[in-house]
Amino acid sequence: MSGRNGGRRQSAVSGRDGGAGSTLTWAALREVKCAELEEAADGWGRTSNRADAARDRIESRLLPGLRGTQKGEAAEAATRRLRGLGTNFQYIYTECGLLRTTLNSLAHEIKTQQRVLQRALDEAAALRFTVHADGSVTYPAGGEGLVDGKPLPGGTASGVPNPGMAAPSGLVAPNPNAGRAQDIADRVAQAVRAAADADWRYARILRSLKAQEGLGVSTATWTDAASDAEAVRQAARGYLKDAVPHDASPAERKAWWAGLTDEQREEYLTVYPDQIGNLDGIPALVRDAANRDNLQLLIGKLEGRNDGDAETRLAALREIDRQLRARTKPGEPPMYLLGIGDQGNGRAIVSYGNPDAARNVAAYVPGLNTSLDMEFARGDLKRARDTAMAAREIDGETAAIAWLGYDAPQLLDGMSSLDVAGTERAETGGRAFHGFMSGLAASNDHDEPHMTAIGHSYGSRTVGAATQYEGGIPEVDDIVLVGSPGVGVDRAEDLHVGKDHVFVGAAKNDVVTHLPSLGSGMLEVAGKPFGPMGELAVDAVRGGDDDLWFGRNPASEEFGARRFVVDPGPPFSLDAHAQYFDPELDTESADSIAMIVAGEGHKVKQESAE
């Protein structure tokens, strides 16, 4: 979005042509008007904000109005064009925001070096030294000669690129003024050198922020935008990122965000949507806005790769994007993107309902074989959506979340993958889930929200790990465990919500929760129909004396939880392990989970524990 100057390199500060060997003088550095750079940044910021407002108008007013009043091919064509226009505005918002931050960051670095320079010049003036145009410093006679006692002659000191490599000035020039002059000359040289380096670094970035011709914003355009964003992130580290409170508590992060100016927030959202969108404690609406923008950058980034993992994640990201853009049907809660990323097996956190405004908030942790793929984008998100819709029929102020914030174990290679038999991923995921729930508690508008942690399959082990921090999971009142292979503790009260607030669903034909109770002869037969998962269950049972893979069976009487009624599920199939949330396949289980989430767990129909 910036121009080129006949292919020649141009200084971002002076606007003059140059190259790698161009020199910036200290006089030119002193005269740089950083206020003009900041004014230009403000102009790009206003353009970015206008584009964002236009995009919001299209998505929140024009598209819903069109869908609600118009039908037919013409309406569909108009909808497509409006969506395209909204994408254009989103691209303008992103690129203009990057320009704003680039110019502000450049001004920040130049002003820093101007202060270094000015302090050196002021010191030279106070000592009556002369700073020449080339940065050398002339100093007067001083000190006393050892032989005649007369003042030692003055001289001139020139700044060196790396003062630490130069011999101490006292060894070559005993005049006490020589050392002071050398120090001043070095600081002048360092300031000029650092400013020149910043000048050319930002000039390269500004040249790259150039829109392609035409009105369409293609995937390739977003790929280019992702590259632009990465370049600006690297350049602006000292200006912005170092201040992001990654090591602070969620409550402190919330306070940090509240204390920023509007301009600062806009810059963080534009340059670091990946950081802000995944920072626990930041308000949900802010995270959603940041992650929707980062989603487009991730799609562009992965589009440029040609490998199977990238294609799998790309398909999932596009499906999530499609759902975010789709019209919310009557009775459905709005969708919020609270986290997105391509690290590990992929990350995605999706809420149905605003978790900050909701009185009841539930977060569901999926388990074995879950990754950022189409199964997650369709199946796991549907579980959260179904739970939210059913719970909102009981209490409309409810939100339900699908949380893929960790690397769940994968059974890609059959028995060669033993991750599921260990606890490392659960412990790592439990730490992340604990932080996420802390963030929800910090950003929720209610004094005492009702919060529920739901773990399915290996996800229940992850939830169990999250409860083992001091005080348990922050603000969580109820815990739901379904299809659980164990949670790492042997008693419900060890989950720190009270045993009457721990609910367990275990289908009769769920291989994960029942294979361990079978005899070894039956294990051999029963494991085969289930492929790698069945083999692993058999191996886990034979390999130890635990009631289940990860401790005592949560569905057992000894564990002490409240076991609710679930459908037994089809035999000799993994479907029994997957239908706990499905209102069509297991109405009783889905309804029970919804009641617990809505704060009415006391109404859940129980069945006897094993």
Spans of features found by a protein language model:
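Stable alpha-helical elements in mature extracytoplasmic
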Residues: 40, 78, 99, 198, ...
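Glycine- and acidic-rich phosphate- and metal-coordinating loops
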Residues: 41, 79-80, 364, 402-404
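Short, glycine/acidic-rich beta->alpha junctions
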Residues: 84, 88, 95, 344, ...
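Residue-level detector of short, conserved catalytic/binding motifs and their immediate flanks
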Residues: 101, 347, 360-361, 477, ...
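Long, composition-driven intrinsically disordered regions
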Residues: 193-399, 411-414, 441
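Lipolytic serine-hydrolase domain surface
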Residues: 341, 353-357, 367-449, 469-610
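Gly/Ala-rich beta-loop-alpha elbow adjacent to hydrolase catalytic centers
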Residues: 454-463
